[in-house]
Every structure is written in C-alpha cells, then in structure tokens.
C-alpha cells in the first residue's frame, strides 16, 4: 500500500446555493464533509487535511473528527489559493496526494481506489492522474510528491495551472461513469443528487 496523503477542499462560499456551506449538505442523513472522509479514510492515509475558508467555524468541529484543518483566510481568492495552502501544510512522507472536493457526493471508496490503482500502474511514468468523463476533466486528482513540489515552486500557481502547463507529465484517464465530474453548485444540482440542507 503506497503512502497516501489526502487533502479535502471545503473553503467555498456556496454562493449559488444562497450562501450555504456545501460540506453541511446532507446525503442520506450524513453531511458531505463526513461522507468524503468516511470513504477516504478507508485508504488509510498517512495524512489527512481539510482546507476551510468560508464557514470555517461551522465546519471545523466536523472536519476535526477526521482530519487536521487549516484555514484559508482569503477564500475569496479562489480554489487555487486553498490548494496552495493545503499543499504547503503537508508534513508527512507521502508518495501520492489525493485532492478531493467537498461537493462531490458521488465519490466513494470505489472511485478513490480506481484512481490509486491507475496511479500505481504508472508509478514513475507520470506525475499526476486526472479522471475524465466524456471529455470533461474531473476530480479528485492524484499528484506525486514531485508534482506537489513543482506546484509550490512557482508563486501563486495552482494545480490546474500546473496540469495545463505540463500535459506530458499527466495521465488523463477516461472513466466509465459520471461520479468524477458531478458536483453541487446550484439548487438543480441539489435536487439531482438528492441532497438537503441541514437546519441544525
């Protein structure tokens, strides 16, 4: 089993949901933040970090049940800023980093294991694994330690920029189902994924 670090991005504002923390959206009675970690923890990560931003105070108690937390004090700068903060916080001797998004309710252990299986098959040949479905890039993504160091070496660069600039180092994998590209941005997405807002 390779050493895997896992980074969960949960800093967004959820503006198109009326300003609601996506990590608290409920699926089958469980918050999305918890659902992710309950699945991802089965990979037995050597390090687990949740990046918070908007709604940090509401999400932190939940996140701390599964991971360390770090806060992006300027989440309005966008996802790439949260990624860099998370990358810089890594302290373990990991081989691979899996970066997940809190608003992907269809991501389960099956999808995560599929990514890691591909990563192991091409060990040493590429520096990143990106799932795709019908030509659309998805998440989570997997980076090697070398890729993480390369992202951090360029100020203000996020993972997306590095992936775009280094296609020869990236394996884009066509996946058989939509789980990797489904996320939650609008009320329509909420209905599609059968999610609800907690009133607690």
Regions found by a protein language model. Name each.
Residues 76-145, 149:
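Conserved beta-loop-beta/alpha segment of the NTase-like Rossmann-fold superfamily
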Residues 17, 59-63, 115, 151, ...:
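Hydrophobic packing residues within well-ordered alpha-helices of enzyme cores
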Residues 19-22, 27-31, 50, 54, ...:
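Residues at secondary-structure transition points
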Residues 27, 70-72, 131, 173, ...:
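Hydrophobic residues at beta-strand termini and immediately following loops
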Residues 33-96, 110:
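Conserved N-terminal catalytic core of the sugar/cofactor nucleotidyltransferase
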Residues 2-53:
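N-terminal glycine-rich phosphate-binding loop and ensuing alpha1 helix
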Residues 8, 21, 33, 86, ...:
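Residue-level signal for inorganic ion chemistry
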Residues 2, 6, 149, 154-200:
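Conserved alpha/beta core of the MobA/IspD/sugar-nucleotide pyrophosphorylase nucleotidyltransferase superfamily
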């Amino acid at each position: 089993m390779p050493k895997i670090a896992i980074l969960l991005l949960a800093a967004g504002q959820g503006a198109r949901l009326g300003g609601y923390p996506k990590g608290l959206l409920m699926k089958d009675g469980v918050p999305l933040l918890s659902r992710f970690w309950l699945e991802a923890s089965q990979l037995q990560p050597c390090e687990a970090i949740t990046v918070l931003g908007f709604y940090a105070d509401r999400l932190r108690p939940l996140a701390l049940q599964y991971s360390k937390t770090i806060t992006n004090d300027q989440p309005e700068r966008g996802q790439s800023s949260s990624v860099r903060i998370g990358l810089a916080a890594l302290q373990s001797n990991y081989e691979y980093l899996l970066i997940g998004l809190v608003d992907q309710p269809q991501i389960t252990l099956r999808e995560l294991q599929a990514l890691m299986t591909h990563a192991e098959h091409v060990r040493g040949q590429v520096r990143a694994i990106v799932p795709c479905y019908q030509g659309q890039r998805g998440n989570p993504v997997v980076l090697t330690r070398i890729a993480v160091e390369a992202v951090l070496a360029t100020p203000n660069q996020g993972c997306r920029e590095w992936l775009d600039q280094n296609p020869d180092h990236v394996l884009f994998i066509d996946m058989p189902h939509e789980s990797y590209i489904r996320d939650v941005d609008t009320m329509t997405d909420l209905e599609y994924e059968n999610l609800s807002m907690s009133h607690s």
